[in-house]
Amino acid sequence: EPKITNGDVVRSYFGLLVLGRTAYEEIELYRANGFFRRALGIRRVPSAETLRQRMDRAAGRFDIAIKEANAVLLGGAALTPVKTELGEYLPLDVDVSPFDNSKTHKEGVGRTYKGMDGYAPNFAYVGAEGYLLNCELRPGTQHCQKGTPEFLAETFALLARLT
């Protein structure tokens, strides 16, 4: 049994994300922080190396569970519809939003349709508030329509859980 459980690794990573930190190395800022540990119910905060290795090993395996949990959370939120003379409608905004990762050597970075090097993730936001319902990281070279029907089908299935 590992000294640092997979649960502690995942909770530590979620803790980083909630704090707006996305680099594995930033976990080092919280390794000796008792409040971080207690607030997340973690026995041991992993090192940056352990966090990176475990998350890389689990790549993609948590995607469905995370999206389902997000849908459950959003199902409890008061989503504001858009009112028109024909009735109320829950807005769903879907967009490919290229990220500028110029001068990096990250895997998947490529020339986007905006003419910069980066990724071309797809996002789906719901409600007038614009809560994130679904997302998909895509290589920068991927055409914006490739995989879109599948992304929309997944998004509509998640949306059905909210309404």
Task: Name each model feature, range by range.
Residues 39-40, 102-108, 133-137:
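Short acidic, glycine/serine/threonine-rich loops at helix termini
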Residues 112-163:
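Electropositive, glycine- and tryptophan-enriched low-complexity nucleic-acid-binding patches
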Residues 1-12, 146:
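Basic, short loop/linker segments at the boundary and entry of helix-turn-helix/winged-helix-like folds
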Residues 40-57:
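Major-groove recognition helix of helix-turn-helix-like DNA-binding domains
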Residues 17-23:
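Short capping segments at the starts of secondary-structure elements
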Residues 24-39:
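DNA-recognition alpha helix
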Residues 12-13, 27, 47, 51, ...:
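Short, conserved catalytic/metal-binding motifs centered on acidic residues
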Residues 52-124:
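Active-site-proximal, Lys/Arg-enriched surface segment
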